Amino acid sequence: MEKQTVAVLGPGSWGTALSQVLNDNGHEVRIWGNLPEQINEINTYHTNKHYFKDVVLDENIIAYTDLAETLKDVDAILFVVPTKVTRLVAQQVAQTLDHKAIIMHASKGLEPDSHKRLSTILEEEIPEQLRSDIVVVSGPSHAEETIVRDLTLITAASKDLQTAQYVQELFSNHYFRLYTNTDVIGVETAGALKNIIAVGAGALHGLGFGDNAKAAIIARGLAEITRLGVALGASPLTYSGLSGVGDLIVTGTSIHSRNWRAGDALGRGESLADIEANMGMVIEGISTTRAAYELAQELGVYMPITQAIYQVIYHGTNIKDAIYDIMNNEFKAENEWS
């Protein structure tokens, strides 16, 4: 692939790591953010120490606060901003962009109030004449590992296979490999909903439960993620892939996962307010829990783990009581769909 110019919107941990991947592949990378101190740090010291204390970025990675300058003549735009501001940033892009570009996103969540997937938001806010079919970049990927060029394999999903293949070639190299998929609904819902299960898995660890319990929540969590995804139109096969069970394993078992760490702290008795204050990063699983719970209620999808975590986070239910309720639910067959 010849050199491309890519705007990365969001200088967080994942946006920074993906910027390095693109730079390693010889592309021109422009990071956009709205914190002048952070942008100045990236340009002056080639660091982003809030997320990576010991990493020095290539000096060819340039950061901007001016969106128009960032988007000038770009071939592709990658959204890596928190879910709650995706619509706002998309509106700003639509007002600024003056040519057609490949539009990608690598965020994982559902819009809190509308319960919409992020590709839907981008489709609504960015006119068709300015964009491709949206490409979702998702899968088992800790930024802390990708930034040091550890092996990472994820998925590029788009309704248009050719566009997904463009993104596959854009990112793939000797340590970072993408597979294509056309099941956008499946890939997006898997990436969003696994954060909820990761909070639950972390809570079990914080409470002192062992590996048996952690394996159970991942397996049963995958089952309810799949139920909701299929109700929305996804293929159940997607959930057995990288963006499904792969992402759930890496997020639901690792200290690198902020959602897992948040759950662990909840299990140890910390308040949600203290957890969010101490984390210093967005915990997508918190807001996604409410969106997924409300969506499941609307569609009549059985999601007992999500419901339990929702009750703990939003109604103050004791975690041990929530676990007790799940363990005393009506008996079911493992492959029962409801």
Swiss-Prot record:
Enzyme class: oxidoreductase
Keyword Lipid metabolism: yes
Biological processes per GO annotation: carbohydrate metabolic process; glycerol-3-phosphate biosynthetic process; glycerol-3-phosphate catabolic process; glycerophospholipid metabolic process; phospholipid biosynthetic process
Alphabetized NCBIfam families for the sequence: PRK00094.1-2, PRK00094.1-3, PRK00094.1-4
Localization of this protein: Cytoplasm
Binding-site residues, sn-glycerol 3-phosphate: K108, G139, S141, K194, D247, S257, R258, N259
Residues spanning the signal sequence: none
Record EC number: 1.1.1.94
Residue numbers binding NADPH: S13, W14, K108, A143, R258, V282, E284
Gene it is expressed from: gpsA
Protein's job: Catalyzes the reduction of the glycolytic intermediate dihydroxyacetone phosphate (DHAP) to sn-glycerol 3-phosphate (G3P), the key precursor for phospholipid synthesis.
Metabolic or biological pathway: Membrane lipid metabolism; glycerophospholipid metabolism
Gene3D superfamilies for the chain: N-(1-d-carboxylethyl)-l-norvaline Dehydrogenase, domain 2 (1.10.1040.10), NAD(P)-binding Rossmann-like Domain (3.40.50.720)
Active site: K194 (proton acceptor)
Reaction(s) the record says it catalyses: sn-glycerol 3-phosphate + NAD(+) = dihydroxyacetone phosphate + NADH + H(+); sn-glycerol 3-phosphate + NADP(+) = dihydroxyacetone phosphate + NADPH + H(+)
Family stated for the protein in its record: Belongs to the NAD-dependent glycerol-3-phosphate dehydrogenase family.
Protein name: Glycerol-3-phosphate dehydrogenase [NAD(P)+]
GO MF entries: glycerol-3-phosphate dehydrogenase [NAD(P)+] activity; NAD binding
Main location (coarse class): cytoplasm
Cellular component terms (Gene Ontology): cytosol
Keywords: Cytoplasm, Lipid biosynthesis, Lipid metabolism, NAD, NADP, Nucleotide-binding, Oxidoreductase, Phospholipid biosynthesis, Phospholipid metabolism
Organism: Streptococcus pneumoniae (strain P1031)
